[in-house]
Amino acid sequence: MDCIFCKIIKNEIPSYTIYEDETVKCFLDAYPDSNGHMLIIPKKHYTNLDDIDIEVLNHIMKISKQMKKLLEERLHIDGLTLIQNNGLVQEVKHYHLHLKPHYQNEQEIMNIEEVYSKLKNN
């Protein structure tokens, strides 16, 4: 299988990993729409929402709440959109949840290493 997210899970492709456990990996989006834009992906390959186990979905939502709190504490976000694409609009055919932060005053996109440092340190 030639899945970019499976390669990220296996560390064949580097990522700015914010959180990882036996079920999921959470990392910064390489092409962010805003500062702190991240993805949560299951380590097991599921193609889309129809394919994924409910227990894994529940775990992803649990981790999304933890990441929201982290984004609020470290990047001082003012809002958060969760996005999960399927079918025609799904670019990578491996289930993933986008966490896209919003800010009262729009900011320029910071260097990914700067965002990573703010989220991983302190």
Residue ranges and their predicted role:
Residues 1-122:
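HIT superfamily nucleotide-processing domains
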